[in-house]
């Protein structure tokens, strides 16, 4: 089974994906590294630009039929069996991205993307099997246990559990300040 771990930058994708792969005894695949290795990604400043169709081709050709956890904020656009969309409180995302040295504009873009469910909506448009997991106030180990429990119980779709509209008024001034 190919499992995509996706979400807005700062939700904990890499940590959760590595732990989940280890727990399930699956291969861990960083989409950035995979794209660079296959020649369908290139470094531009601090980021990797990816040709999505080419990356999907290589995923299909080299990983289909294998057990792997794909880590990356584009993983929900790949040919996978299950998409896990990780979510986190927008302010928490802003704090994490500030700690990583993101500039104000990038922080604002990502906090807003989380606030309006951007990645979740894309995942639902691309796939039937989508599970949404709120990582706020949970350890990575607890998030992995929740994912494994959902997989083992046969749940293939669970969306709509996160609603940031309740914190919208609190987040808008935060966005104007660039996450400060």
Curated annotation (Swiss-Prot):
Ligand binding (ATP): 10, 12-15, 100, 138
InterPro entries per the UniProt record, alphabetical: Adenyl_kinase_AK6, P-loop_NTPase
Top enzyme category: transferase
UniProt region (NMP), positions on chain: 30-50
Transmembrane domains' residue ranges: none
UniProt keywords, alphabetically: ATP-binding, Kinase, Nucleotide-binding, Ribosome biogenesis, rRNA processing, Transferase
Molecular function terms, GO-annotated: adenylate kinase activity; ATP binding; ATP hydrolysis activity
Key word Transmembrane present: no
Reactions catalysed according to its record: AMP + ATP = 2 ADP; ATP + H2O = ADP + phosphate + H(+)
Assigned protein family: Belongs to the adenylate kinase family. AK6 subfamily.
NCBIfam families noted in UniProt: PRK03839.1
Task of the protein: Broad-specificity nucleoside monophosphate (NMP) kinase that catalyzes the reversible transfer of the terminal phosphate group between nucleoside triphosphates and monophosphates. Also has ATPase activity. Involved in the late maturation steps of the 30S ribosomal particles, specifically 16S rRNA maturation. While NMP activity is not required for ribosome maturation, ATPase activity is. Associates transiently with small ribosomal subunit protein uS11. ATP hydrolysis breaks the interaction with uS11.
Subunit structure: Interacts with uS11. Not a structural component of 40S pre-ribosomes, but transiently interacts with them by binding to uS11.
Protein name: Putative adenylate kinase
């Amino acid at each position: 089974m190919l499992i995509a771990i996706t979400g807005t930058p700062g939700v904990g994708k890499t940590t959760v994906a590595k732990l989940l792969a280890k727990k399930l005894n699956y291969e861990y695949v960083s989409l950035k590294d995979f794209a660079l290795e296959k020649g369908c990604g290139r470094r531009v400043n601090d980021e990797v630009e990816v040709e999505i169709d080419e990356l999907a081709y290589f995923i299909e050709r080299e990983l289909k039929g294998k057990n792997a956890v794909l880590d990356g904020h584009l993983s929900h656009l790949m040919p996978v069996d299950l998409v896990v969309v990780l979510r986190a409180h927008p302010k928490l995302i802003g704090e994490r991205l500030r700690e990583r040295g993101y500039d104000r504009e990038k922080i604002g873009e990502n906090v807003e993307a989380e606030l309006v469910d951007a990645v979740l909506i894309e995942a639902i448009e691309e796939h039937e099997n989508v599970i949404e997991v709120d990582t706020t106030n949970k350890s990575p180990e607890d998030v992995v246990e929740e994912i494994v429990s959902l997989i083992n119980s046969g749940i293939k779709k669970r969306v709509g559990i996160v609603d940031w509209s309740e914190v919208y008024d609190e987040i808008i001034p935060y966005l104007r300040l660039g996450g400060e």
